[in-house]
């Protein structure tokens, strides 16, 4: 009997699907006004647009004993890195070298005026989400760090600027129905099913898409949708400059 839906310490590079995760930063930063990310939000791109959360290797459960995703993976070969040492649940970042963002990666994505993280990934630029995403998910991708984050952006940024993202921006401070969001985001992925995550107050926090690993073609997202049943009255898009930290 499975005790968790994930496989800790799975072999890196063994999976069948990707999940592209976008987040709405105002929902993540509410109640965290002392954090650097929240202090950067007012008037920013992320205050009114979706941000990049991550790109997650996912299993076809039938091929992995019912498990849904790998995490904190182990790289094959002599001397291969074991990212289970990075899991906060088991001590967290015991091996700082492999668990953190490399200087070259910071330079490529965050350290120059052309870096994309301050605009599109504020939790990466001003928080510790980049290190978390690399250790938990990137370690399972079969890629090294810079190519992994380049793929994250290649898959996620077109969705940020797509039909669904435009709908979110247009409804800041108001509501959108689940059907409206599903149709708008579905139009960006050939009509495939998209999943959403909402707070207990029905504020939109995440949007998840699924891709076939081999072809990168959109497929139906099997991740649970926490908005569809509880938010029949509408899904709220938080206006940070009105309802955020002041």
Residue ranges and their predicted role:
Residues 36-246:
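Domain-level detector of nuclease and nuclease-like folds
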């Amino acid at each position: 009997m499975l005790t968790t839906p994930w496989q800790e310490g799975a072999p890196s590079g063994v999976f069948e699907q990707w999940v592209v995760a976008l987040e709405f930063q105002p929902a993540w930063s509410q109640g965290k006004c002392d954090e650097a990310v929240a202090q950067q939000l007012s008037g920013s791109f992320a205050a009114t647009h979706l941000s990049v959360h991550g790109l997650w290797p996912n299993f076809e459960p039938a091929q992995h004993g019912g498990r849904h995703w790998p995490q904190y993976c182990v790289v094959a070969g002599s001397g291969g890195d074991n990212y289970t040492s990075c899991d906060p649940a088991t001590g967290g970042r015991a091996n700082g070298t492999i668990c953190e963002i490399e200087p070259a990666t910071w330079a490529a994505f965050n350290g120059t005026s052309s870096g994309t993280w301050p605009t599109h990934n504020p939790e990466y630029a001003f928080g510790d989400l980049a290190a978390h995403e690399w250790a938990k998910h990137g370690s399972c991708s079969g890629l090294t760090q810079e190519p992994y984050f380049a793929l994250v952006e290649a898959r996620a940024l077109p969705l940020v600027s797509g039909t669904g993202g435009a709908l979110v921006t247009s409804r800041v401070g108001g509501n959108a129905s689940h059907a409206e969001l599903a149709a708008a985001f579905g139009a960006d992925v050939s009509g495939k099913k998209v999943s959403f995550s909402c707070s207990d107050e029905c504020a939109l926090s995440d949007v998840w898409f699924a891709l076939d690993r081999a072809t990168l073609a959109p497929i139906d997202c099997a991740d649970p949708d926490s908005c569809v049943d509880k938010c029949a009255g509408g899904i709220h898009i938080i206006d940070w400059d009105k309802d955020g930290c002041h």
